A protein has these predicted regions:
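All-alpha RGS (Regulator of G-protein Signaling) helical domain and cognate RGS-like helical scaffolds
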Residues: 2-424
Length: 424
């Protein structure tokens, strides 16, 4: 879609409720197992240990035996993962074009963005046509189609902020599942697509006056996390739309979320970090001019568009008290209000901070049935790389289960609510 399209909340009655389910479900959760007993390779000398199948071709690897590639999903896991990715590509195609249609040239100029910047965003939308075509072809005739969407932004700054958040979800969602795909051929194509998504996310951060890449590693998240974030902005889909199997988790909100539009980003009113009641909503940009950093031509404080910004007052810091509220499960959400938020977790006890390669827990102090607080951790990935930075993810959990990037999805049964944290 290009130009202005119909957008707004869904007002009808859903004809289907809940995620798509298999005919049989074998267990309530995936049980943790010890390391793979065949994963024993170790090369202490740095020499070839096994016969080479051909010259200049070390032994091993997947899909390296000469078999002709088949660029199609190869399991239910593959199908549901790529279908989720296609939902993401469709909304981005509509979103980028919609912002260009609803805001004038003058609106963009007030935000410091020129005709060249608008052309750049238009080209990103064109990129999404290619991504959507690729994923559709790898899914076949049951591939999801484009839907109608409900966006939260009211200004160009809020449009850009929403873009940097939704592309963060798109990128991190793929990093979370790409190495679990049964089809290595599909993973190859997807990796060459998501590399472009990463550049889009960085570009929108630059347009918002944030540091383009303040981390050493990008974050991967489970599919149910990506779907939880994304589905809130899909108003309705065609009646025969392919549905998804992923869980919709309850929303978690940061009451004192940093506002990147502010001269002092932590001096925010409660819930100023959201223009609405959805977790990827942009921060309020309509603040008094003497409190705004947008047109402030002072090094260290200006947050107008730039290749890079280094703010004197960071958006967050270790030890910051983070005030939280969250929703109860059972909320109708997503396309046609046909999905329902759910959780299998017990009482929340911890806040999980998911950023870069790290999963860090901090204790949660409850202040009510659906409110509490914690403190931003000072954890590092490696020395000199604070883990909590960038546009990252937080979750309430009932335990502090040890997990790593490759098996992070095993946290899902323990998640009470899920949110996004604007750390930097």
């Amino acid at each position: 879609m290009t130009g202005f399209t119909s957008h707004g909340p869904y007002s009808g009655t859903p004809t289907t409720i809940g995620a798509v389910m298999a005919n049989t479900t074998l267990a309530t959760a995936i049980a943790p197992l010890p390391p793979n007993p065949t994963a024993t390779y170790y090369n202490a000398q740095g020499v070839l240990l096994n016969p080479a199948p051909a010259p200049y071709t070390p032994n091993g690897g997947l899909g390296t035996n000469g078999t002709e590639p088949r660029y199609m999903v190869n399991s239910d896991f593959d199908f549901e993962s790529i279908a989720l990715g296609l939902y993401q590509e469709w909304i981005e195609l509509d979103l980028f074009n919609n912002g260009l249609a609803v805001f004038s040239e003058e609106d963009f100029l007030e935000a410091g963005l020129t005709a060249e910047d608008r052309a750049y965003i238009a080209f990103m939308a064109i990129q999404e046509t290619g991504h959507a075509t690729l994923l559709t072809n790898m899914l076949g005739e049951a591939a999801p189609v484009q839907c109608t969407y409900n966006y939260p932004f009211r200004t160009v700054r809020e449009f850009i902020d929403f873009n940097q958040k939704i592309t963060r979800v798109g990128e991190s969602g793929v990093w979370g599942f790409i190495n679990h795909l049964d089809s290595r051929e599909v993973a190859q194509m997807l990796s060459q697509s998501i590399a472009t998504e990463a550049r889009q996310q960085m570009s929108f951060r630059q347009m918002l006056g944030l540091h383009p890449m303040p981390v050493w590693f990008e974050t991967g998240i489970p599919q149910s996390w990506a779907w939880t974030f994304l589905s809130q902005y899909i108003s309705s889909c065609p009646a025969n739309q392919t549905r998804l199997a992923w869980q919709n988790l309850p929303n978690l909100f940061v009451v004192n979320q940093a506002n990147p539009n502010r001269l002092s980003p932590n001096d925010t009113a409660p819930f100023e970090g959201y223009v609405g009641n959805r977790t990827l909503d942009p921060a309020y940009s309509t603040i008094p001019s003497n409190e705004s950093c947008v047109n402030l031509n002072v090094t260290g404080y200006n947050c107008g568009p730039a290749i890079a910004r280094n703010r004197s007052e960071p958006l967050s810091f270790p030890g910051k008290q983070v005030n939280l509220t969250w929703q109860a499960p059972g909320l109708a959400i997503g396309p046609n209000n046909s999905y329902v938020t759910s959780t299998t977790a017990g009482q929340p006890q911890f806040v999980a901070w998911v950023s870069q390669l790290n999963l860090t827990y901090t204790p949660l102090t409850l202040t009510g049935n659906y409110s509490g607080y914690t403190y931003q951790p000072a954890s590092e990935v490696y020395q000199g790389d604070p883990a909590a930075n960038d546009t990252m993810f937080i979750a309430l959990t009932d335990s502090d289960i040890f997990l790593t990037p490759f098996n992070l999805s095993m946290i899902n049964p323990h998640v009470v609510a899920l949110g996004l944290y604007q750390a930097g």
